[in-house]
UniProtKB/Swiss-Prot annotation:
Major location category of this protein: membrane
UniProt family annotation: Belongs to the cation diffusion facilitator (CDF) transporter (TC 2.A.4) family. SLC30A subfamily.
Topological type in the membrane: Multi-pass membrane protein
Gene expressing this chain: MTP10
Sequence ranges on the Cytoplasmic membrane side: 1-140, 189-209, 270-287, 333-428
GO biological process: regulation of abscisic acid-activated signaling pathway; regulation of jasmonic acid mediated signaling pathway; regulation of salicylic acid mediated signaling pathway
Organismal lineage: Eukaryota, Viridiplantae, Streptophyta, Embryophyta, Tracheophyta
Organism listed in the record: Arabidopsis thaliana (Mouse-ear cress)
Keyword terms of this UniProt record: Ion transport, Membrane, Transmembrane, Transmembrane helix, Transport, Vacuole
Database matches in NCBIfam families: CDF
Gene Ontology molecular function: monoatomic cation transmembrane transporter activity
InterPro entries in the record: Cation_efflux, Cation_efflux_CTD, Cation_efflux_CTD_sf, Cation_efflux_TMD_sf, CDF_Transporter
GO CC terms, sorted: vacuolar membrane
PANTHER family (alphabetical): METAL TOLERANCE PROTEIN 10 (PTHR43840:SF35), MITOCHONDRIAL METAL TRANSPORTER 1-RELATED (PTHR43840)
Pfam family, one: Cation_efflux
Name of the protein: Metal tolerance protein 10
Length: 428
């Protein structure tokens, strides 16, 4: 199948059930007609102008998106209702069609992004070197502020734990202790990444990010297990807490202040894209939840029933284990070489084909996680009689374009003169 057809075949065959697409290719122009059956009626939607009303297009080796457009009605209504209410009020088939077109809109946006790289020679929105330095400085500031605040709040919560002797408050305090330990782990990771060593780490230290986060999350999940066991022991022993009014006021004041500070830090750290700073944001959000539960259960245990306090500690422990176990799984996936989603591979294919007229075939397009970003491997076929200098320049400029994408850490472009050979790499 010609590559022109392949790109849009991938683009169009993600349609919902009971939807049929006919594809016709005319030079570099691709026509697609959709037939959707809804409530017994059949109608036609032309995603591209028909031959009669379309302006003539010049023959070109490039994939052209100028004539492509989605229908004005995408099968879904956007009348301001919440997504939750639309889910129950909108017929299932209409929801599927609407979701399908939203996916196509996102894919078109990705293709337009690739077009921008072809036209301008660089990706839009890529920060300059000066902007990158300022961003790195602000990220380091966010890490230092978080660590210093965690130290101060830990001291305050130790006092609250001593005054209240609440298991839920103690669980929250132990969480703050581990915040300091985990903060040191993340700081060490970020600091190590800023010191490149081309001899020991020839492709950089970016994989230290997910490794540091996995260690961080593992320690937090271990804390949750310990608190769970201790709270269960208290429930079996039927041991409650006792506080006078002064101790209760001190505990409430400290825990409320800590929760407010953590909430503000969470909002601050969420504004960054760096994975380590966002891990701090997740930790601050976790502290807001655990502090709120710890305070509420401690006060309720004093006012009403003793068992509310260890029950609250168990809830905190379960939340801790679930949250950080999910974080571990997410970062493990980024280290094991998981393939990029089909939409991203389609963007890469579009970029590669439009790179140069002499590219006759695209043999391989592969992208997989290797840390927080993707490694990309591309095999392209050039004319066998092409000069080495010209072939090298085509491959090198394509590599530079691929590495401009924010999701790509490193790209490898392999040049060949035919595509009927056996696999060139060992597959385990």
């Amino acid at each position: 199948m010609p590559l022109n057809s392949y790109i849009f075949f991938l683009f169009l065959t993600t349609s919902p059930r009971n939807t049929f697409f006919g594809i016709r290719t005319h030079s570099d122009r691709i026509m697609a007609t959709e037939h959707i059956t809804r409530t017994g009626d059949e109608y036609n939607v032309e995603l591209l102008p028909s031959d009669d009303d379309a302006p003539p297009l010049e023959s070109s080796w490039r994939l052209n998106l100028d004539a492509f457009q989605l229908p004005s009605s995408t099968g879904g209504r956007h009348d301001g209702r919440t997504r939750f209410s639309r889910y129950f009020r909108t017929p299932r088939k209409e929801r599927r069609v609407s979701e399908y077109y939203k996916k196509q809109e996102r894919l078109l946006e990705g293709f337009n992004e690739m077009e921008t790289i072809h036209e301008n020679g660089f990706a839009s929105g890529v920060p300059t070197e000066e902007e990158m330095k300022k961003l790195a400085k602000s990220e380091r500031l966010a890490v230092h502020i978080s660590n210093a605040t965690n130290l101060v709040l830990f001291v305050a919560k130790v006092y609250a734990s001593m005054e209240s002797r609440s298991m839920a408050v103690i669980a929250s305090t132990l969480d703050s202790l581990l915040d300091l330990l985990s903060g040191f782990i993340l700081w060490f990771t970020a600091n190590a990444m800023r010191k490149p060593n081309q001899f020991h780490y020839p492709i950089g230290k970016r994989r230290m990010q997910p490794v540091g986060i996995i260690v961080f999350a593992s320690v937090m999940a271990t804390l949750g297990l310990q608190v769970l066991l201790e709270s269960g022991r208290q429930l079996v022993a039927k041991s409650g807490i006792h506080m006078n009014s002064t101790e209760e006021k001190w505990m409430i004041g400290i825990m409320v202040s800590v929760t407010i500070v953590k909430f503000l830090l969470m909002l601050y750290c969420r504004g960054f894209q760096n994975e380590i700073v966002r891990a701090y944001a997740q930790d601050h959000l976790f502290d807001v939840v655990t502090n709120s539960i710890g305070l509420a259960t401690a006060v309720l245990a004093v006012k009403f029933y003793w068992w509310i306090d260890p029950t609250g500690a168990i809830l905190i422990a379960l939340y801790t284990i679930a949250t950080w176990a999910r974080t571990v799984l997410e970062n493990v996936h980024s280290l094991i070489g998981r393939s990029a989603p089909p939409d991203f591979l389609a963007k890469l294919t579009f970029l590669i084909w439009n790179h140069h007229e002499q590219i006759k075939h695209i043999d391989t397009v592969r992208a997989y996680t290797f840390g927080s970003h993707y490694f990309v491997e591309v095999d392209i076929v050039l004319p066998e009689d092409m000069r080495l200098q010209e072939a090298h320049n085509i491959g090198e400029t394509l590599q530079e374009k691929l590495e401009q994408l924010a999701e790509v850490e490193r790209a490898f472009v392999h040049i060949d003169f035919e595509f009927t050979h056996r696999p060139e790499h060992k597959c385990n």
